[in-house]
Amino acid sequence: MSQDSHSESKPGHAGDSAAHVLPIAAIVHADHAGTDRLLAKFVDGLRHAGLRIHGLVQERAANADKTSTMLVDQHSGQRYPLFQNLSSGSTSCCVDAGSIAAASVAMRRAVEARPDLCVANRFGGLEAQGGGLAAEMLNVAAAGIPLLTIVSNDYLRAWRAFTGDSGTELQPSIEAMYLWFAGLRARHARS
């Protein structure tokens, strides 16, 4: 993707004038350097502006190992551990599938609550295979609730297939998130 906060010419990128079928966007990144914190900062800004936010944000204490990573329910504040603490010799996936299943209730509640925005910590390997929070993400977007997530370049092709190229791809910046969200709200106000 270009460094411009708008887009490349591919449909579904921020800055396109075409109407999107789904009110869904992903912050696209090459590495995790601060992307979770950017999403959390954006969510905090919207919440302080009086908007209702649901979903999950990923949080990890500075200088902590990845087993300290939590999914934080943006409505209730409940925290779910994202990773299992496996032995150093283990070759199993350390993502805690049971914890993700428990955390998915935050996404399902969003469909009932109809918040201004729902966030999903990321579209990653599990979602690329149809697992993780994939079903919940589609249900939120299909209900017409704006959904924002994070996707690595590694899963960008799967993300595009998942959204049918109807999702918006954002640069990892607060400005890009605000522009996307403001555009959605403006289109909603006109309809």
Please name every model-derived segment.
Residues 153-167:
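Glycine-rich, charge-decorated loop segments at or immediately adjacent to ligand/cofactor-binding or catalytic sites
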Residues 128-138:
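Short Gly/Thr/Asp-enriched flexible loops that form oxyanion-binding sites at enzyme active sites
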Residues 36, 40-87:
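N-terminal phosphate/diphosphate-binding loop that engages ATP/GTP or pyrophosphate donors
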Residues 34, 126-129:
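Short, solvent-exposed loop/turn segments at secondary-structure junctions
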Residues 2-4, 8-53:
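Glycine-rich P-loop/Walker A and Walker A-like loops and their local beta1-loop-alpha1 context
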Residues 137-153:
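Substrate-engagement module of ASCE P-loop NTPases
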Residues 171-191:
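A charged, well-structured terminal subsegment
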